[in-house]
Amino acid sequence: MIIEARKGNTQPALSWFAQKSTLSNNQIADWLQIALWAGQDKQVITVYNRYRHQQLPARGYAAVAVAYRNLQQWQNSLTLWQKALSLEPQNKDYQRGQILTLADAGHYDTALFKLKQLKSGAPDKANLLAEAYIYKLTGRYQDELRAMTESLPENASKQQYPTEYVLALRNNQLAAAIDDANLTPDIRADIHAELVRLSFMPTRSENERYAIADRALAQYAALEILWHDNPDRTAQYQRIQVDHLGALLTRDRYRDVISHYQRLKKTGQIIPPWALYWVASAYLKDQQPKKAQSIMTELFYNKETIATDLSDEELADLFYSHLESENYPGALTVTKHTINTSPPFLRLMGTPTSIPNDTWLQGHSFLSTVAKYSNDLPQAEITTRELAYNAPGNQGLRIDYASVLQARGWPRAAENELKKAEVIEPRNINLEVEQAWTALTLQEWQQAAVLTHDVVEREPQDPGVVRLKRAVDVHNLAELRIAGSTGIDAEGPDSGKHDVDLTTIVYSPPLNDNWRGFAGFGYADGQFSEGKGIVRDWLAGVEWRSRNIWLEAEYAERFFNHEHKPGARLSGWYDFNDNWRIGSQLERLSHRVPLRAMKNGVTGNSAQAYVRWYQNERRKYGVSWAFTDFSDSNQRHEVSIEGQERIWSSPYLIVDFLPNLYYEQNTEHDTPYYNPIKMFDIVPAFEASHLLWRSYENSWEQIFSAGVGASWQKHYGTDVVTQLGYGQRISWNDVIDAGATLRWEKRPYDGDREHNLYVEFDMTFRF
């Protein structure tokens, strides 16, 4: 069977090994080697993991090292090469395997140094080929061509040129030295496949990878014309069709990958697993996560168990295909698998040192991401903080930590962490993207624009960059705001029956970064015993937004009772830090004056001040004071305390407790509008937000609310207040956010319990 396997007939031997329950160490090594000859890299690793605690011959470890290298798991490959060399330190093939893997991992200087030591023994064609390979990876194409030329046999004809030599000539712009017509179809297909493979090398820069992929695409275009209708080139034509998927993926042409894949499926062409992974990656990047999840589940799961030989990139794509499909159990399964199968550190054979295991770090990064998207931000913060501070030199971990701080509503804390990360690699794309998001939150518009412009120029197709650019583009749009309410069945004395309250405002795009102009219209009406009250407002103003500061000044013409009067408003707030904010508002012809008062010719001016304390997304409180000076000599003082305590959170449900206290005092008593001498409300409530559907920036949720409390009014005693509410809210494509809520309330007015049934609505639209 071994002899047959060497001839290419590997299946009988593989079947025999699979049926045996007991194997010697040499037989295990045979199994590993034959599986490698069969091109079953993942099977090699599966078998090795089953017998990893046995002392295998060096050839067994070497086979596993090659399999790991084929799967681009460089560190695992290097560990196995070290094991093989510890048993056979003079084996030149093993030394070359280690050297080539070092080059793949980006350790070019170490690889060249070890190769120089190996070459010092005696000239060897294989060493020259290894040298050319390293120079090709480093971009030293002249040295690559020199080494390849030295490796050629004397008097080699063009038809005998190896694929690597042809590539070396092309890398040095010497393609004219090659007569493509004299190259065999297999060599031309090999060249195309090699270009695609090189375009995926993670140690190359993005520009290098794009340039290589462009060469592969150009070569595909030429070969496609030659072989499309040539029945003698069917095998080679099918090869380049599959490899074409990889070149398109490297160039971030995700929709082209998908359409090409669909064309191949229609022709009945078999797509190998590694090419299906390219397709799944394209679906994921094109925001079609469920299709990506379907393909990856078929590729990477054995029944319900995740394969043990996945690369870090494959694990990440599988994880995000679950997460972005809202499949949290699946994402958690990948997370647990990654953590449970990966030790924190890897020890290099033959050395006392150990190095951090990137896969273990990735697993804990998954853990924090699942917590973040499951609305468990405290756990996400704990995980990312521990990782960031235990690995201070890891920039990515600190960026992840800053992202969680930003999600918790602490942009200044996030900004500080990003400053620390900046020391390591100031122009890292992910760093600048996160800095731009923080700048947007802090209203540092110019800084956000500069950072966004830089990353868009460098990595325009990066998904994080695309998302950031979209946010900045939306910020620069005009904005329409509509808000109001309408009564359905009301008995309350303030707003009247079948009341309507509507405000529509249009904001201009940002002017000189910080300014926006706005104009709008307001309308309110209600039916009272003394007649119908109507108020119309025409308003215009300016808004200022900068770091820590928001200001808005408004002038309004208010029409009521067949006359019009000028009104004005000045509002603003200031943030001291991530936790504390103070704000105030001054208003002439205030909107705090009830509609019924204005129906009876009573107006008023008001002043308001408030303090807000924000701990995090799970707890916040605010205290406000308002004073209204009515034109009928009444003076009203109002004090309120409002808060939020999160008592439950899960991926689809959030429940908050909303304590609320309100105190009001008036100096005049006999007025045509509701005007208690003193009143005090305590009405705690609960609000539940249930996510019905979400896809990236689009979501649909429903909100339930209920509250029961008490209201005390001087001379009328205490009575019960009850509140119920149900609403829905839609967010769409970053430009629409709209909601409507049906509310019912029953409360005492001057000793009589009366009810109000009404609808509140609001919409923000960017255009």
Residues covered by each model-derived region:
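Negatively charged
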Residues: 2
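Gram-negative and organellar
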Residues: 8, 14-17, 24-26, 30-32, ...
